[in-house]
Structures are given as structure tokens and as C-alpha cells.
């Protein structure tokens, strides 16, 4: 299936023709590099996080910052959809939970419920059954404000913290993000505090009489019924937990949070966990100036885009879900190494020199529950997140260091960092041959059936994209496909290929991202390019190319009623992924690649980069998507530089893992 989005493409550009485009993009990116060598770009989610930020401030009863609230309000109103509500991604369908939170936040800062934009949103909420039909986290937010009874929130007793590790529901069996969000939330559920809410704003008008929350529809019906029955029992016995047991469990939660507080980068370095930690300390009576509460509160502010947004300058403000400096810096370093030349390579070396001391060498994080004898050696995604290094980031940084080390006399500079990273990453391989992002063997699938997990994102099982990056890292470092760990990993990738030839992408949207990742890995692992799996993937990428020469994929491709790839207008990031995937397996001279390169050439903006409103980053399928503002800047440059290099070499072979 193809989508026509612009006029016909030009004839094939020669490498000399793309050189000015490459140089213009390179200069633009170099201008965005920080003096210490790193890059970081805005990371935007949906209306939920900015709305929650407003609600957090009013929950805590903090003085209103009218200027900031006005700018967040402007942001929320701008991204309201034509359907009357708020979506999880640009151009998406109305999401009930995001709409409830955005409406509540706007009302909190003074928007009249009778204003046209509020009336449209309210009508859409009521048409869908009202706020009672929102997801679990939204209902928790409403319960914290006294806008809903806690009986409508699935019960997660704080005593869960005292359960032995063999117990079926244990925090160590959950993904890092679920763990860090849940632990402070357990305290809130136990104490049931009520927001200060000094303006007394509620949203009674969003409820439909006699409507109750809907039961989870996905998952295993037997497990669903079991956990649903258990939830009813837990609600009934909740008032009768022994007080000393409850106090011990709360103490365990506080210890967990405080141990992982992570300075001004916050618990887990993600907004929901950080906000919950602030509310936990508040509910326990910690004053505002208490060191732990104060530093957690400052961590929230670190996520704010206050100095002008890329889209609207200083007219708007929003809160990011987290920060992405390690990821952005490593990927730009790859792009600069591909561009080559003294200036670009110097910037890449500067970036890698910034990354080197960020490596986590001394802290055994939560991952050690499954790998107690493994030495740490990974990188996080954020500025700091020592308990939660990211396998994907680690593999990407390691490959960039390996490539840079081949330049002149730099081998010794990164050798020790690479060795520790390789040791840790390989040690994190799961039993099925693949890798998860933060834990090994985190595949307790029955947990996604508990009522609390209506988001379906409680786990961190092995995924194709992360596993492909690990294969790429190992192969680029010279590990042969005959190595047992490498063979298991390649077998995992081949087994996970979809019938149409694509691969699922967990952390990027979606099948284009997964297929790019897998093709890069299989190429550097020395699978022949005429291998059936590679040929099927190449054919699939060519089949879904848009008529304008680019590629695009909608976030709806993650729908539960799986039908595969969902076409969309071409985007710079997804076009670059498709091109990098095709070029990795010998397709640099194909018509499809020529068309794609032309699309990038034609869509470069005056600054030298590319604009992209669409979301191409994956947070949690069907629940949370990300717009990486850097993706449309460095991935196209990377693809163009690789195209030029392959054309100049007149030998279309890619020797690197990405």
C-alpha cells in the first residue's frame, strides 16, 4: 500500500549533489552541540504530562505561577484535536484519559467549563462514558483530588513490598518503569491523602451517573478473571491489614525510593515516578524543605522546557516525560562519524569524551536481581539513572566508540569503556537469545492481566530492536555468528520476523523501525544479502514506500487488533530508517533508495534540518508515544552521508552495526 503526499521525485542525485545538503545539515547540528560535547533535544509526549504537572502543583498547594500556567494552557489548547479532545500522538484519535487530564488541568488554571474548547472536550468525554471510564492512572489522579472514590481504583496493597521473591506479584518481576512508578504509589494508595487543591476545583461534570470502570479486555481471560476476583477480595480486606505490617511496608517503600532518589534527575529519571515520589514524601508529612522531598521536587522542574520550545518559542511551556542526552549524543556521534571530515569527527570525539565518564561502573542496579554476578558497565538514557542503565543506549554508545577508536590514535581512549560495556550487555542476554531494555528474562506475562496493568506495559521482555542493536554491537566488535550467544541472538531475530517480512519495533514506530534495526544487525553479522529473511524485508520496505519517495508509519500500527503496518505521510526519521536499512543490505543503487534520498533532499528546511510533527518514538504501545525532536535532525543526515559514502566507494557494503 502506498500513500501519495507530494509531487514526483527528481532523477537520481549523485554524491556531489547531496554534499551541500550534508554540509548544511552538519553545520546546523554542530551549532546545537553543547560546549561540553553533548547534545540533547526536546522529548515531547502528549497532553498528559503537562496536565499532570499543573495538577501536581495544585495537589501540593503551591503558589500559582500564573505566567507558567498560562504558557502550559496555551500549549494544551494548541494541541487539542479537531475531534474535541486530546490524542496520544499528532493526528491521532481522541484518548479519553488524556482528555480528562487536560480538561481538569485547564479548568484548574482558570478556563471556564463553558468555553467552547472545554465544552467540546466535555461532550466527547461524556459520550465515551465519562471520567469513570478513564484508565487506572487517571482514576488514581482523580481519587487523589477526592473527585472519585478509591473503590474505583484497582487495589495494590502496600504490603506487596513485604512479599517474598517467589510470590507471583513481586516488584522485581515488573519492568523498571512500573517498579519506580508503583512503589511510591503504594504508599499513596495506603494513606489515601487528599489534594490541598486550594481553589477547590473538581470535575463532577465529567461523570455519567451509574457508569462504572470497564474491565480490561485484552490478555488471558483466565488470568483476568482470577486477578479481578482477587482485586475484589483485596478491596474488602484492605482496612484490616495489621498496623505494624502496614508501617513496615511503608518504611520499605520509603527506603526503596530514597535509595534510588537519583539526585536532581529523580526516581527512575521519569516524570510519573518522580511526581509520585514527591507526593509520597508529602503524604508522609515531610516538609517542603526536607532534603529528600526538596530534591525530588527539583527533579520535576528539570523536565520543564522553560527557555522556549522548538515549535512556539517562549509562547509556550511544557513538561517532558524524561530527558534523552545519552541517546541523542550517541546517535548524533554516529551521524557525525558517517559524515566524516575533521570538523564532524572532532565533534563526535568530543561527544564520546562526554559520554565516557557517564558510564555506570560502580552501581549494581535493579538489573542485578537477575544477574547478581555481572559487573556493571552500561549507560543510562538520561543524564543520570545509575540504578537503571539501558541496554539499547549501551550498545549504541559502544558501537560509536568502537568506530571512533579506529580513527588514528584513539583506540586506547575507549578500549576499557568498550570492554566493560560489552561484558555487561552480553551478560544481560535473556534465555531466549534476545535482550530487554533494562532487565533480563522479564517475561512474567501473567502480570499484564492484573487490573492495575490496564496499560499492558508492566513488563520489559526481549524485543527485536534492542536485540538487534546488541547483535550489531557484538558483530561490529568481531564476534562471529558461530559464537553461541551470537547464534542464539541471530536465531531470535529470525524467529521474530513477521510473515510479511517486517519486524516489530518496540521503542520506535514501528515496523519500519524494527526492520531497520534487524537489517543492520543481520548485515554486520554476515548473513548473506540473498538470505530469504533479508530479501523478504527488502521487498516489504519497497512495497510500503510512499509515492513521494519517503516512508511513514502511523502509531495506530500498535493496535491490539493487529493488522501490521499502518501507512502515513512520509516523515524524515522514518524515511531515514528505511534508507539505512536498505543500504545496510546492498540496496544503495536501488530505485527505492534513490527516491528516498530525493525525498530527504527536497524536504530539508532553511536551517538545514528537517521538521517533523509526527511521533515516531515508542514509549508504551497504545498508551504512550514520544516525539523525539532530534530524530528528524540527525537520522536524515546519517542516511544522506551513508548514501554519499557508498556511492563514492562504488562498493555498497556497510561495515558498521548501525
UniProtKB/Swiss-Prot annotation:
Q: Which GO terms describe its biological process?
A: triterpenoid biosynthetic process
- Enzyme Commission code: 4.2.1.129, 5.4.99.17
* Name this protein carries in UniProt: Squalene--hopene cyclase
> What reaction gets catalysed by this protein?
squalene = hop-22(29)-ene; squalene + H2O = hopan-22-ol
Q: Which organism is it from?
A: Zymomonas mobilis subsp. mobilis (strain ATCC 31821 / ZM4 / CP4)
Question: Which Gene3D superfamilies does this chain map to?
Answer: 1.50.10.20
* Pathway(s) of this molecule: Secondary metabolite biosynthesis; hopanoid biosynthesis
Alphabetical GO CC annotations of the entry are:
lipid droplet; plasma membrane
Taxonomic lineage is: Bacteria, Pseudomonadati, Pseudomonadota, Alphaproteobacteria, Sphingomonadales
- Record's function text: Catalyzes the cyclization of squalene into hopene.
Regarding protein family, the annotation reads: Belongs to the terpene cyclase/mutase family.
What the entry lists under NCBIfam families is as follows: hopene_cyclase, squalene_cyclas
Topology relative to the membrane:
Peripheral membrane protein
Amino acid at each position: 500500500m502506498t500513500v501519495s503526499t507530494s509531487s514526483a521525485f527528481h532523477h537520481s542525485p549523485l554524491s556531489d549533489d547531496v554534499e551541500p545538503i550534508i554540509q548544511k545539515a552538519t553545520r546546523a547540528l554542530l551549532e546545537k552541540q553543547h560546549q561540553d560535547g553533548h547534545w540533547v533535544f526536546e522529548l515531547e509526549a502528549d497532553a498528559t504530562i503537562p496536565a499532570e504537572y499543573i495538577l501536581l502543583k495544585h495537589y501540593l498547594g503551591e503558589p500559582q505561577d500564573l505566567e507558567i500556567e498560562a504558557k502550559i494552557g496555551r500549549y494544551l489548547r494548541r494541541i487539542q484535536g479537531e475531534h474535541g479532545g486530546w490524542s496520544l500522538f499528532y493526528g491521532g484519535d481522541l484518548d479519553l484519559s488524556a482528555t480528562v487530564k487536560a480538561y481538569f488541568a485547564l479548568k484548574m488554571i482558570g478556563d471556564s467549563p463553558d468555553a467552547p474548547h472545554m465544552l467540546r472536550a466535555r461532550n466527547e468525554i461524556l459520550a465515551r462514558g465519562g471520567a469513570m471510564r478513564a484508565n487506572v492512572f487517571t482514576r488514581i489522579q482523580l481519587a487523589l483530588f477526592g473527585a472519585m472514590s478509591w473503590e474505583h481504583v484497582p487495589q495494590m496493597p502496600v504490603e506487596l513490598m513485604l512479599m517474598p521473591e517467589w510470590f507471583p506479584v513481586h516488584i522485581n518481576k515488573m519492568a523498571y518503569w512500573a517498579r519506580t512508578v508503583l512503589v511510591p504509589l503504594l504508599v499513596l494508595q495506603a494513606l489515601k491523602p487528599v489534594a490541598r487543591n486550594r481553589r477547590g476545583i473538581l470535575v463532577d461534570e465529567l461523570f455519567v451517573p451509574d457508569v462504572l470502570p470497564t474491565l480490561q479486555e485484552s490478555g488471558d481471560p483466565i488470568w483476568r478473571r482470577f486477578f479481578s476476583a482477587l482485586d475484589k477480595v483485596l478491596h474488602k480486606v484492605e482496612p484490616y491489614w495489621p498496623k505494624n505490617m502496614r508501617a513496615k511496608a511503608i518504611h520499605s517503600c520509603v527506603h526503596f525510593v530514597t535509595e534510588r532518589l537519583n539526585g536532581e534527575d529523580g526516581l527512575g529519571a521519569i516524570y510519573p515516578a518522580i511526581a509520585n515520589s514527591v507526593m509520597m514524601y508529602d503524604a508522609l508529612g515531610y516538609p517542603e524543605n526536607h532534603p529528600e522531598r526538596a530534591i525530588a521536587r527539583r527533579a520535576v522542574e528539570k523536565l520543564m522546557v522553560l527557555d522556549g520550545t522548538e515549535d512556539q518559542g517562549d509562547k509556550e511551556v511544557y513538561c517532558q516525560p524524561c530527558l534523552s542526552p545519552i541517546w541523542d549524543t550517541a546517535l548524533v556521534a554516529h551521524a557525525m562519524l558517517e559524515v566524516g571530515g575533521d570538523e564532524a569527527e572532532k565533534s563526535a570525539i568530543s561527544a564520546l569524551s562526554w559520554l565516557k565518564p557517564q558510564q555506570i561502573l560502580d552501581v549494581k542496579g535493579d538489573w542485578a536481581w537477575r544477574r547478581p554476578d555481572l559487573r556493571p558497565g552500561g549507560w543510562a538514557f538520561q543524564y543520570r539513572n545509575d540504578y537503571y542503565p539501558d541496554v539499547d543506549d549501551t550498545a549504541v554508545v559502544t558501537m560509536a566508540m568502537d568506530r571512533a577508536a579506529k580513527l588514528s590514535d584513539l583506540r586506547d581512549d575507549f578500549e576499557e569503556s568498550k570492554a566493560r560495556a560489552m561484558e555487561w550487555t552480553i551478560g544481560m542476554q535473556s534465555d531466549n537469545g534476545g535482550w530487554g531494555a533494562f532487565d533480563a528474562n522479564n517475561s512474567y506475562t501473567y502480570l499484564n492481566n492484573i487490573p492495575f496493568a490496564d496499560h499492558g506495559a508492566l513488563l520489559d521482555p526481549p524485543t527485536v530492536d534492542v536485540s538487534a542493536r546488541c547483535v550489531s554491537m557484538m558483530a561490529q566488535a568481531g564476534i562471529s555468528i558461530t559464537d553461541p550467544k551470537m547464534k542464539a541472538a541471530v536465531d531470535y531475530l529470525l524467529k521474530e520476523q513477521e510473515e510479511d517480512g517486517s519486524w516489530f519495533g518496540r521503542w520506535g514506530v514501528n515496523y519500519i523501525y524494527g526492520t531497520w534495526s534487524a537489517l543492520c544487525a543481520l548485515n554486520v553479522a554476515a548473513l548473506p544479502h540473498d538470505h530469504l529473511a533479508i530479501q523478504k524485508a527488502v521487498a516489504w520496505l519497497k512495497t510500503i514506500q510512499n509515492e513521494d519517495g519517503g516512508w511513514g508509519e502511523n502509531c495506530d500500527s500498535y493496535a491490539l487488533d493487529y493488522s501490521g503496518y499502518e501507512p502515513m505521510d512520509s516523515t524524515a526519521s522514518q524515511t531515514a530508517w528505511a534508507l539505512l536499512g536498505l543500504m545496510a543490505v546492498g540496496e544503495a543503487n536501488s530505485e527505492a533508495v534513490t527516491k528516498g534520498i530525493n525525498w530527504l533532499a527536497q524536504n530539508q528546511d532553511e536551517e538545514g534540518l528537517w521538521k517533523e510533527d509526527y511521533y515516531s518514538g515508542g514509549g508504551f504501545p497504545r498508551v504512550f508515544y514520544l516525539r523525539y525532536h532530534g530524530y528528524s535532525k540527525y537520522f536524515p543526515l546519517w542516511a544522506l552521508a551513508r548514501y554519499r559514502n557508498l556511492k563514492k566507494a562504488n562498493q555498497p557494503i556497510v561495515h558498521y552495526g548501525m
